[in-house]
A protein has these predicted regions:
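NTP-dependent small-molecule kinase module
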Residues: 1-5, 24, 28, 112, ...
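Hydrophobic anchor at the beta1->P-loop junction of P-loop NTPases
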Residues: 10
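P-loop (Walker A) phosphate-binding loop of NTP-binding proteins
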Residues: 13
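ATP-binding Walker
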Residues: 16
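Walker A/P-loop
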Residues: 19
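Post-Walker A helix-loop "phosphate-sensing" segment adjacent to the P-loop in P-loop NTPases
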Residues: 27-38
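ATP-dependent small-molecule kinase phosphotransfer cores
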Residues: 36-93, 120, 135
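A glycine- and Lys/Arg-enriched "phosphate-lid" helix/loop adjacent to the NTP-binding pocket
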Residues: 97-142
Length: 175
């Protein structure tokens, strides 16, 4: 994976594995891992849910775009985005990352992961029908993910190690 620049952007739905895979991949290839939501929370001294509640989703998306701009073009960096970070206002800057990996998982898998991790995500969805919410979000975001990514990886029914090994192979194939 030797290149003049080798930044990696991880995109996909909430619970598709962006943070988990990003951390594991960074350990294997010795890149710096950054989580967009954590960066925004640290920078603005507020939780993501508080920003959404008080300033609105549009403001949060602006913060995400700033984060993409700040981290684009860095060498040996992995940036895990929020699920909605790739949109009509950010797609252009997203394309400046060398490797843009779309982590996919079925809606059923996303729901299972949410149930398994609900204590960590209590404010993620305020709904009685998560399947409908996730399906609607996916339909809204799928085109952006597709147009942004140059690597697609299904994360359902695979171990973290299998996913990271497959990603390293796919990255090497692009070189």
């Amino acid at each position: 994976m030797e290149n003049s620049r080798s930044d990696i952007l991880l995109i996909g739905m909430p619970m598709s594995g962006k943070s988990t895979i990003g951390k594991a991949l960074s350990e294997k290839i010795k890149y710096t891992f950054n989580d967009m939501d954590n960066i925004i929370e640290d920078k603005y001294k507020r939780t993501a849910s508080n920003i959404f509640e008080t300033l609105g989703e549009e403001q949060y998306r602006l913060y995400e775009r700033e984060c993409l701009e700040d981290f684009s073009g860095r060498d040996k960096l992995i940036l895990s985005t929020g699920g909605g970070a790739i949109n009509d206002k950010s797609i252009e800057i997203s394309l400046s990352f060398k490797y843009r990996i779309w982590l996919q998982a079925s809606i059923e898998e996303l729901i299972k992961r949410y149930v398994d991790d609900e204590k960590e995500r209590p404010l993620l969805y305020n709904t009685n029908n998560m399947e409908v919410v996730l399906t609607d979000l996916y339909r809204t975001r799928e085109t952006f993910y597709m147009n942004c990514s140059n690597i697609v990886m299904n994360t359902s029914s695979k171990t973290i190690n299998q996913i990271t090994d497959e990603l390293i192979t796919k990255i090497d194939e692009l070189n």
